[in-house]
């Protein structure tokens, strides 16, 4: 695609940053076709977006098909290999994939034991699942940026098809995972502390006056509630945006390097060297971001189980 004569470098970059979007265009929306024809919709219409402007016009009533599809596919891949190893597990020394899975499970279990000091059988499997899934989604960033989009265009017969293959470069995916972690955090908080204990945690920390100065709490409780609520909401936002920002930046660098192939043979050769060098460095980003997301998820689960001293 980088060498296409119909695309400028700006068009190329914009095209690679746009998701395949299915959604509802409002009645009265004017669709501009490639042949110059303009079609005004008479009714609200569910359709695939042909341009970035159409995707934006769909607003909240839209689904990023590529993000959803690749996310589900990679989750199934992780589940398949985990189940295959579990079914074939024996008391003998593990080899091949089984050895790698054992190394992964033992390593993450060690991290969970260091961070999570409570009893909950769900947390370690959750951490393993989160790390494996996020790592696989991040790993898609190492596939050359044009390969899968071009294959999708050939199969579909649509040379303008949008097709992003790295789910974690879509903030909808990363924030969606972060919100799920946030909901689990709230669930375990209420489960472990009770609804009243959870409310007290929001209103009686970090500042609380002794009983003989109870009247100061009339001021401190609203202040505490604002501070704790902001801190609580910031957790999923920072968790999701951290993963998105790092992977999006890495993907953008790959795309910018790929534009060198359209300039000429010399720049194409330079681009190949840069692609390889950045891919090697980006492996660390892929691993670290999956690890950080997993560790923070475990930390948030530990915070949900922690009990503050009663006043």
From Swiss-Prot:
<keyword id="KW-0138">CF(0)</keyword>
<protein>
    <recommendedName>
        <fullName>ATP synthase subunit a</fullName>
    </recommendedName>
</protein>
<keyword id="KW-1133">Transmembrane helix</keyword>
<dbReference type="GO" id="GO:0046933">
    <property type="term" value="F:proton-transporting ATP synthase activity, rotational mechanism"/>
</dbReference>
<dbReference type="InterPro" id="IPR045082">
    <property type="entry name" value="ATP_syn_F0_a_bact/chloroplast"/>
</dbReference>
<dbReference type="GO" id="GO:0045259">
    <property type="term" value="C:proton-transporting ATP synthase complex"/>
</dbReference>
<feature type="transmembrane region" description="Helical">
    <location>
        <begin position="123"/>
        <end position="143"/>
    </location>
</feature>
<comment type="subunit">
    <text>F-type ATPases have 2 components, CF(1) - the catalytic core - and CF(0) - the membrane proton channel. CF(1) has five subunits: alpha(3), beta(3), gamma(1), delta(1), epsilon(1). CF(0) has three main subunits: a(1), b(2) and c(9-12). The alpha and beta chains form an alternating ring which encloses part of the gamma chain. CF(1) is attached to CF(0) by a central stalk formed by the gamma and epsilon chains, while a peripheral stalk is formed by the delta and b chains.</text>
</comment>
<dbReference type="GO" id="GO:0042777">
    <property type="term" value="P:proton motive force-driven plasma membrane ATP synthesis"/>
</dbReference>
<keyword id="KW-0406">Ion transport</keyword>
<keyword id="KW-0066">ATP synthesis</keyword>
<keyword id="KW-0375">Hydrogen ion transport</keyword>
<keyword id="KW-0813">Transport</keyword>
<comment type="similarity">
    <text>Belongs to the ATPase A chain family.</text>
</comment>
<dbReference type="InterPro" id="IPR035908">
    <property type="entry name" value="F0_ATP_A_sf"/>
</dbReference>
<dbReference type="GO" id="GO:0005886">
    <property type="term" value="C:plasma membrane"/>
</dbReference>
<dbReference type="Pfam" id="PF00119">
    <property type="entry name" value="ATP-synt_A"/>
</dbReference>
<feature type="transmembrane region" description="Helical">
    <location>
        <begin position="62"/>
        <end position="82"/>
    </location>
</feature>
<keyword id="KW-0472">Membrane</keyword>
<keyword id="KW-0997">Cell inner membrane</keyword>
<comment type="function">
    <text>Key component of the proton channel; it plays a direct role in the translocation of protons across the membrane.</text>
</comment>
<feature type="transmembrane region" description="Helical">
    <location>
        <begin position="253"/>
        <end position="273"/>
    </location>
</feature>
<dbReference type="InterPro" id="IPR000568">
    <property type="entry name" value="ATP_synth_F0_asu"/>
</dbReference>
<keyword id="KW-1003">Cell membrane</keyword>
<feature type="transmembrane region" description="Helical">
    <location>
        <begin position="213"/>
        <end position="233"/>
    </location>
</feature>
<feature type="transmembrane region" description="Helical">
    <location>
        <begin position="276"/>
        <end position="296"/>
    </location>
</feature>
<feature type="transmembrane region" description="Helical">
    <location>
        <begin position="179"/>
        <end position="199"/>
    </location>
</feature>
<dbReference type="InterPro" id="IPR023011">
    <property type="entry name" value="ATP_synth_F0_asu_AS"/>
</dbReference>
<keyword id="KW-0812">Transmembrane</keyword>
């Amino acid at each position: 695609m980088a060498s296409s004569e119909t695309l400028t470098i700006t068009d190329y970059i914009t095209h690679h940053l746009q998701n395949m979007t299915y959604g509802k265009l409002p009645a009265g929306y004017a669709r501009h076709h490639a042949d110059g024809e303009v079609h005004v919709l008479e009714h609200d219409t569910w359709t695939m977006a042909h341009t970035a402007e159409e995707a934006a016009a769909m607003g909240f009533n839209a689904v990023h098909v590529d993000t959803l599809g690749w996310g589900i596919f990679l989750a199934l891949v992780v589940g398949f290999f985990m189940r295959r190893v579990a079914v074939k597990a024996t008391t003998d020394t593990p080899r091949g994939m089984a050895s790698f899975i054992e190394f992964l499970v033992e390593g993450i279990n060690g991290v969970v034991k260091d961070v999570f000091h409570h009893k909950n059988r769900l947390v370690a499997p959750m951490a393993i699942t989160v790390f494996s899934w996020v790592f696989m989604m991040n790993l898609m960033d190492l596939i050359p940026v044009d390969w899968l989009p071009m294959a999708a265009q050939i199969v579909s017969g649509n040379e303008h098809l949008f097709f992003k293959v790295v789910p974690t470069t879509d903030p909808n995916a990363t924030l969606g995972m972060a919100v799920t972690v946030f909901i689990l955090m709230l669930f375990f908080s209420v489960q472990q502390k009770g609804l009243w204990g959870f409310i007290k945690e929001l209103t009686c920390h970090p500042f609380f006056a002794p009983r003989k100065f109870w009247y100061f709490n009339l001021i401190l409780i609203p202040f505490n509630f604002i501070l704790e609520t902001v801190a609580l909401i910031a957790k999923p936002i920072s968790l999701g945006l951290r993963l998105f920002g790092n992977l999006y930046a890495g993907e953008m660098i790959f795309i910018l390097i790929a534009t060198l192939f359209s300039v000429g043979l010399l720049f194409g050769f330079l681009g190949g060297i840069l692609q390889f060098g950045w891919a090697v460095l980006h492996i660390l980003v892929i691993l670290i971001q999956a690890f950080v997301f997993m560790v923070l998820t475990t930390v948030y689960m530990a915070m949900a189980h922690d009990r503050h001293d009663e006043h």
